[in-house]
């Protein structure tokens, strides 16, 4: 689960991380209240969406920049008015962009130098890893590609926690002065506590800055949490912004389906994440474009299959459907019955290709064969993929 920058900074403050003073607003009337909380001078106006690249983004009406540095409150209010309710397109939103429904006003900071700092889960080592760089304010992927020697990594033993020597190592490699180093050490420890105690999957600050008076501030904040651990943090669940999520993905989660919308026109219904990714790959291989990732899991019920079809058909870009099932735990006949019920309920008019293999496959194929449905059978994954690509061409 992702949260907005203003929410992440509020969380940071609870752990003692220094952040610029700020205030969010959701309406033009709230602009006045929010700005009244801030001192006169430079104000940074930030669009709040769950995507990066806001500063370089463009709104659909042509207004450029989802982050604006303003010299006065009047200028900040004017910029916020152009952002609120507008749709911001960035490199991470896709062409559809995201509608801005919250504005975050920040007091401007005096920047001496910018850094990058993030805490992530390294699945290769099964440990948290702190990633830091002297090149802040830039895309970390570009830094890793162009100047990999400027990125430092410290893996943390979860049984022991973040050690003092590891903090000192980071402070030394990042080149902080003695005065800055004390504040940086405090901030790094606070960020790690925030990461660990909230079951976060990512805490990112880009940029982390030093100021002329030796302070170390989190100028930006991005936090994501492990969905599987949210039951331990009901206070974090309240921060979820459903407006930032695809309605189809929200509906899928209600039925315990793993769904991610994509930009293609061939919908996929598959059991198992690995098979789902392979199915998308083979569709691309034969010239098609997948419309989604949809894993119904190893023990889906008939009701879940019906729900999956309804979610798929909620995407207006879908021109055909490929069902690819390999039954291990999954009973192929349950899938087949779900397909029959779903098609009859929603009145499917799109091409449908079904490939079934594995547990109780004979009964599943018999159910489909006697259903009277207009569908195409696939003898193999490659055969099924070729058929659906041809049908939607």
Curated annotation (Swiss-Prot):
Query: Which residues does substrate bind?
Result: 271, 328-330
Q: Which residues form the ATP-grasp domain?
A: 9-251
PROSITE patterns membership: SUCCINYL_COA_LIG_3 (PS01217)
Q: Which GO terms describe its cellular component?
A: cytosol; succinate-CoA ligase complex
Where is ATP annotated to bind?
Answer: 46, 53-55, 109, 114
Keyword Repressor tagged: no
According to the record, cofactor stoichiometry and binding are noted as: Binds 1 Mg(2+) ion per subunit.
EC main group = ligase
User: Which Gene Ontology molecular-function terms are recorded?
Assistant: ATP binding; magnesium ion binding; succinate-CoA ligase (ADP-forming) activity; succinate-CoA ligase (GDP-forming) activity
| Cofactor field | Mg(2+)
User: Is ATP-binding included in the keywords of this UniProt record?
Assistant: yes
Which InterPro entries does the entry mention? ATP-grasp_succ-CoA_synth-type, ATP_grasp_subdomain_1, Succ-CoA_synthase_bsu_CS, SUCC_ACL_C, Succ_CoA_ligase-like_bsu, Succinyl-CoA_synth-like
Q: Where does Mg(2+) bind?
A: 206, 220
The protein's UniProt keywords, in alphabetical order, are: ATP-binding, Ligase, Magnesium, Metal-binding, Nucleotide-binding, Tricarboxylic acid cycle
Reactions mediated catalytically: succinate + ATP + CoA = succinyl-CoA + ADP + phosphate; GTP + succinate + CoA = succinyl-CoA + GDP + phosphate
This protein's pathway? Carbohydrate metabolism; tricarboxylic acid cycle; succinate from succinyl-CoA (ligase route): step 1/1
The protein's Enzyme Commission number: 6.2.1.5
Query: Among the record's GO biological process terms, what is one?
Result: succinyl-CoA metabolic process
| Highest taxon of the lineage | Bacteria
- Family statement drawn from the similarity comment of this UniProt entry: Belongs to the succinate/malate CoA ligase beta subunit family.
Function (record text): Succinyl-CoA synthetase functions in the citric acid cycle (TCA), coupling the hydrolysis of succinyl-CoA to the synthesis of either ATP or GTP and thus represents the only step of substrate-level phosphorylation in the TCA. The beta subunit provides nucleotide specificity of the enzyme and binds the substrate succinate, while the binding sites for coenzyme A and phosphate are found in the alpha subunit.
Q: How does it assemble?
A: Heterotetramer of two alpha and two beta subunits.
Protein known as: Succinate--CoA ligase [ADP-forming] subunit beta
Q: Which organism is it from?
A: Opitutus terrae (strain DSM 11246 / JCM 15787 / PB90-1)
**Designated gene of the protein:** sucC
């Amino acid at each position: 689960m992702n949260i907005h920058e203003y929410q992440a900074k509020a969380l940071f403050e609870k752990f003692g991380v220094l952040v610029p003073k700020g205030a969010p607003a959701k309406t033009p009337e709230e602009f006045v209240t929010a700005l009244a909380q801030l001192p006169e001078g430079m104000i940074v106006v930030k669009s709040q969406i769950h995507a990066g690249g806001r500063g370089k983004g463009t709104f659909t009406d042509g207004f450029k920049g989802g982050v604006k540095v303003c010299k006065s409150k009047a200028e900040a209010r004017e910029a916020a008015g152009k952002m609120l309710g507008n749709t911001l397109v960035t490199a991470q939103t896709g062409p559809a962009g995201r509608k801005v429904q919250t504005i975050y006003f920040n007091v401007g900071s005096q920047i001496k130098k910018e850094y990058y700092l993030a805490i992530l889960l390294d699945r290769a080592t099964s440990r948290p890893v702190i990633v830091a760089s002297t090149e802040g304010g830039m895309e970390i992927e570009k830094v890793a590609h162009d100047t990999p020697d400027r990125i430092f990594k410290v893996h943390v033993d979860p049984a022991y926690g973040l050690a003092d020597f590891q903090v000192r190592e980071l402070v030394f490699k990042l080149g902080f002065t003695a005065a800055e180093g004390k504040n940086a050490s405090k901030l790094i420890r606070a960020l790690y506590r925030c990461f660990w105690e909230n079951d976060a999957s990512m805490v990112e600050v880009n940029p982390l800055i030093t100021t002329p008076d030796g302070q170390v501030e989190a100028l930006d904040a991005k936090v994501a949490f492990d969905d599987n651990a949210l039951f331990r943090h009901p206070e974090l669940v309240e921060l979820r912004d459903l407006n930032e999520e695809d309605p189809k993905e929200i509906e899928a989660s209600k039925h315990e389906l793993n769904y991610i919308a994509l930009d293609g026109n061939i919908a996929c219904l598959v059991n198992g994440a690995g098979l789902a990714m392979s199915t998308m790959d083979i569709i691309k291989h034969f010239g098609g474009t997948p419309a989604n990732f949809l894993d119904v899991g190893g023990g889906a019920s008939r009701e879940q299959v019906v729900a999956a079809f309804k979610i798929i058909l909620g995407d207006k870009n879908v021109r055909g459907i490929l069902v690819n099932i390999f039954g291990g735990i999954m009973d192929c006949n349950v899938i087949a019955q779900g397909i029959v019920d779903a098609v009859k309920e929603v009145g499917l008019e799109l091409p449908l290709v079904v490939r079934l293999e594995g547990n109780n496959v004979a009964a599943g194929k018999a159910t489909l064969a006697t259903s009277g449905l207009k569908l195409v059978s696939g003898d193999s994954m490659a055969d099924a993929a070729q058929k659906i690509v041809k049908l939607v061409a």
